[in-house]
Amino acid sequence: MVSSAEAIVEHLRPVEKDPEVARPIAGELIDAVGADYDIVHGGFGGPTKFPNATLLDALLVKGDPTSLDMAQNTCEHLVRGGIFDQVGGGFHRYSTDSQWAVPHFEKMLYDNALLLATMARCWRRTADHDSDRRDLYSHAARRTVAWLNREMRLPNGLYAAGLDADSDDAAGHTHEGIYYLWNQDLITDALGTDEAEWLRPLVHLEPCNDNGLGTLQLRGRVEWERINADMDTLLEARGRRSAPARDEKAITAWNAMLIDGLVEAGMILREWSWVEQARELADSLWTAHWDDGMALRTSFHDRPGVPAVCEDYAWVALSFAGLAGATGESVWLDH
């Protein structure tokens, strides 16, 4: 037994040197990404663009001026663009164009959980004097949390996997994104003529179909209190439309990502209720998806699904450790 253990140790010994080269390799990989950076609209590659929260986080951690500029510029264009649901909050799946104007309209829990933390980190790494950008990032985080709580929370306290891209128009015909699209007449009907005219130069309409319906995009300096009030009015009007279907499946890793995002963003932006929300979600996740040391990957309407995989255990461990640090409750470390 001892000789076997010694043999294993000797076999693994070369691996101990790997961390020494990990940092420069990671830096080189991040530098290489710059070749695909869109200096005008932010993001990487194209014309189809994904937000890529993990890459943005890596740029924020790297922290040199070039990396920070790429992350901040990308986050600003994400929040101003049609890929962000200006009316209801939350990010769509990806953009079909280089300007983040016309998204694929599906909304996923994991994208929004990760981007919630990214927006808060970007806020933290942006100078105090750049208040316009900081306000954009914190606005995106707050509207995203509001959307998650309004539309994604399941009766058992967990969060649904996503929202479909398609829904029906007034005539019962199915279209992608129709639930989220506007034209000037629809905005005027909801807000009234005077308010719609005030909003017109600040919120650009990007047509997505032959009917002139389009996504909303923020322009110029934002008067947040008034625009948020207008968006809330539009949200109420939109609530009378046929909504996209919700994927009612609860996925362990994705809910754990949200725990991590709520803790991180709550601590950074001093939204302490988000940390409490993360604690409640962790409690629900532990109750619903854990049994005698084994975890579920999924559940559907409280019916257990398949067993957990490595991703689920990793994200639960990470998020529970962060929650323990934020709350001082050792029970999350025990879990």
PLM feature segments, named:
Residues 1-268, 299:
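Replace the tail clause
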Residues 253-256, 261-333:
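Long, K/E/R/D-enriched contiguous segments that form extended
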